[in-house]
């Protein structure tokens, strides 16, 4: 009973905090509002830790049916809380990272008049994510799924007077509606063919659905899994539907940390892992997920190399790491996908918040305009370095364990995407070193006053990052231990499912494959150092500068070819331009045609035209009503003459 109450409190506390601060304390007592927001999140994190320890040591599953929600004939759905090992680890990630972001925001948003509204939105975001991961049915999960989408819209567009923020919020919301439409169709298909939305019932019928063919090569389950995976592709910003993620950087930096590390983008990975019982019986969709994930991790990493905005580089890094997680799910290594999700949450939040400290200090996003901040911000530099090395996958940091496990799984499965993953690992090291060198080690390009006043952030912003540093160090070792438990899928043995034919013999992976990711990362570090040292002649080509003396050694014809690839990467493979040309402009043209049809034809000859005729006759009637007796006498005489003439004409003919 105690654990059940704790489980309820974990989810309810962020909601209560959001409601109290948003509705009551926003304009009354801001100090009390801050205390409530932070204390409620810390309590939620503490209770999550208790539940996690219980799930780890005892293996206990908590299932609470709170109230009946939908009842229609034989179709019943309860509003419930379901906590197993997968949910408990997600609770830890969401509540701990969210708590850090809340505390950090007190310093980062200290001078913002809307800070209480901001904290209210953050708490609401946390609540919906907790609802999503604790659901025991697809309809309740969908409520959390849409909830985080709405909150992302509110937070990305938090500075609503900023036009770019409004556009970014709309872009994120609309892009996710595209994938969510497929997700809704998937849930509807599940309900139609299974008669239930509860996980347990749906998972038990997976094998039967896989044998129910609707096309020659496709089963009902294939269609369901494909629709669900499209929903996950949009939410987790995979290639094609990734375009909203970089623009989400228009919101405050703490929002970026929360969206990219612990909440919205991880929802897609969580759903694929939760539905492993379905996806395992749909090998064709698993192959599709593997390809999407592999392409995304390489595609996003290549774009990150040529970006200049520090937050957008980290955003594309997130997109790339999510590709790794998708690839892991595609090769049935769901445990390594969740493992990387956990480790990534800590070091990516650390990177974003450290970047926020830099931006807060120098009020600049362009890394080519920074430089030599190591002496001004040594603590921030240390935090950023730890986060970057964890991202690259250097031992003994957490990324070494989780990313390598994914690549080992891809190799063991025989997937060609292993090559993509290894290449992306090298690119990850290159763009990580790019940030470190240009922001902290390069020659400063900041104005003298700005550089002299650069400083470490307040303790409110710095101290919470200690938790993320600890997570970046120790979550990898702890996770590796939990996954090494003598059970299928290790710690997640009751949450995840693998068919025997898809189990990966990772223990038999050659040693050189195990060491290859870190070796490639080290090579990438060396390349990054070489590329971004000012003395090298091709540095200017890569940084979009024009220094003729340094490019004279390259033939002019070849120089344009060399710049061709960087220009493609700098423009993000022209995805935005292609979508604008193929989708946005045609929709605008179609909308204009509908406008013409509605305003110029239907309204003109319909209600507006009829109204004009009425107005004309009304005006004519008004002219007749002059008020003079001689005019009325003339009308009467004229009418009598016309009437007599009519009868005379009729009698004659």
From Swiss-Prot:
Family statement: Belongs to the complex I subunit 5 family.
Domain of life of the native organism: Bacteria
Protein name: NADH-quinone oxidoreductase subunit L
Recorded GO CC terms: plasma membrane
Keywords: Cell membrane, Membrane, NAD, Quinone, Translocase, Transmembrane, Transmembrane helix
Gene source species: Rickettsia typhi (strain ATCC VR-144 / Wilmington)
GO MF: NADH dehydrogenase (ubiquinone) activity; quinone binding
UniProt topology in membrane: Multi-pass membrane protein
EC number: 7.1.1.-
Keyword Phosphoprotein: no
Function summary: NDH-1 shuttles electrons from NADH, via FMN and iron-sulfur (Fe-S) centers, to quinones in the respiratory chain. Couples the redox reaction to proton translocation (for every two electrons transferred, four hydrogen ions are translocated across the cytoplasmic membrane), and thus conserves the redox energy in a proton gradient.
Main location: membrane
Catalytic activity: a quinone + NADH + 5 H(+)(in) = a quinol + NAD(+) + 4 H(+)(out)
Residue ranges crossing the lipid bilayer per the database entry: 8-28, 35-55, 89-109, 115-135, 138-158, 178-198, 214-234, 253-273, 285-305, 313-333, 336-356, 377-397, 418-438, 465-485, 511-531, 577-597, 629-649
Subcellular location: Cell membrane
Keyword Cell membrane: yes
GO biological process, one term: ATP synthesis coupled electron transport
Pfam families: Proton_antipo_M, Proton_antipo_N
């Amino acid at each position: 009973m105690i654990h059940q109450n704790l489980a309820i409190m974990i989810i309810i506390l962020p909601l209560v905090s959001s409601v109290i601060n948003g509705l009551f304390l926003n304009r009354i007592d801001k100090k009390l509002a801050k205390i409530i927001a932070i204390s409620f999140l810390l309590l939620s994190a503490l209770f999550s830790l208790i539940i996690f320890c219980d799930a780890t040591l005892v293996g206990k599953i908590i299932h609470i049916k709170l109230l009946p929600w939908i009842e229609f004939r034989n179709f019943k759905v309860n509003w419930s809380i379901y906590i197993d090992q997968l949910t408990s680890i997600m609770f830890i990630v969401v509540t701990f990272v969210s708590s850090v972001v809340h505390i950090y925001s007190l310093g980062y948003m200290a001078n913002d008049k809307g800070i209480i509204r901001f904290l209210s939105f953050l708490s609401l975001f946390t609540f919906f994510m907790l609802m999503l991961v604790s659901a025991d049915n697809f309809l309740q999960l969908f409520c959390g799924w849409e909830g985080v989408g709405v909150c992302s819209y509110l937070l990305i567009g938090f500075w609503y007077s900023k036009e770019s923020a409004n556009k970014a919020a709309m872009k994120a919301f609309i892009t996710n509606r595209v994938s969510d439409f497929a997700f809704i169709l998937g849930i509807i298909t599940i309900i139609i063919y299974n008669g239930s939305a509860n996980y347990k019932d749906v998972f038990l019928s997976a094998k039967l659905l896989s044998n129910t063919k609707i096309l020659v090569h496709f089963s009902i389950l294939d269609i369901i899994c494909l629709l669900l995976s499209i929903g996950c592709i949009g939410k987790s910003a995979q290639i094609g539907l990734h375009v909203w993620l970089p623009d989400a950087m228009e919101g405050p930096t703490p929002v970026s940390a929360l969206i990219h590390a612990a909440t919205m983008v991880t929802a897609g990975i969580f759903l694929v892992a939760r539905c492993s019982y379905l996806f395992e019986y749909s090998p064709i969709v698993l192959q599709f997920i593997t390809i999407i994930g592999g392409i995304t991790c390489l595609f996003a990493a290549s774009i990150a190399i040529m970006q200049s905005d520090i937050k957008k580089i980290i955003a594309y890094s997130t997109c790339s790491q999510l590709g790794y997680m998708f690839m892991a799910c595609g090769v049935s290594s769901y445990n390594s996908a969740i493992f990387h999700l956990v480790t990534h949450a800590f070091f990516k939040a650390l990177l974003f918040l450290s970047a926020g400290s830099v931006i807060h200090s120098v009020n600049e996003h362009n890394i080519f305009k920074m430089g030599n901040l190591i002496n001004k911000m040594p603590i921030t530099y240390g935090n950023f370095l730890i986060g970057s090395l964890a991202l690259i996958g250097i031992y003994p940091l957490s990324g070494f364990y989780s990313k390598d496990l994914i690549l080992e799984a891809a190799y063991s499965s025989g997937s060609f995407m292993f090559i993509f993953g290894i290449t992306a690992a090298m690119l990850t090291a290159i763009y990580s070193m790019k940030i470190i060198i240009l922001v902290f080690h390069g020659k400063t390009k900041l104005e003298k006053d700005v550089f002299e006043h650069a400083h470490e952030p307040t303790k409110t912003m710095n101290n919470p990052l200690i938790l993320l540093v600890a997570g970046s160090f120790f979550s990898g070792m702890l996770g590796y231990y939990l996954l090494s438990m003598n059970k299928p899928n290790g710690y997640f043995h009751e949450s995840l499912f693998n068919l025997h034919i898809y189990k990966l013999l990772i223990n038999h992976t050659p040693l050189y494959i195990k060491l290859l990711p870190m070796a490639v990362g080290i090579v990438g570090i060396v390349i990054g150092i070489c590329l971004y040292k000012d003395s090298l002649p091709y540095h200017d080509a890569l940084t979009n500068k024009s220094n003729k003396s340094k490019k004279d050694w390259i033939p002019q014809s070849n120089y344009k070819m060399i710049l061709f690839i960087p220009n493609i990467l700098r423009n993000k493979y022209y995805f935005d331009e292609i979508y604008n040309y193929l989708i946005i402009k045609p929709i605008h043209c179609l909308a204009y045609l509908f406008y013409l049809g509605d305003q110029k034809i239907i309204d003109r000859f319909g209600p507006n035209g009829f109204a004009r005729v009425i107005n004309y006759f009304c005006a004519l009637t008004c002219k007749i009503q002059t008020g003079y007796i001689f005019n009325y006498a003339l009308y009467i005489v004229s009418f009598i003459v016309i009437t007599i003439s009519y009868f005379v004409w009729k009698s004659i003919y």
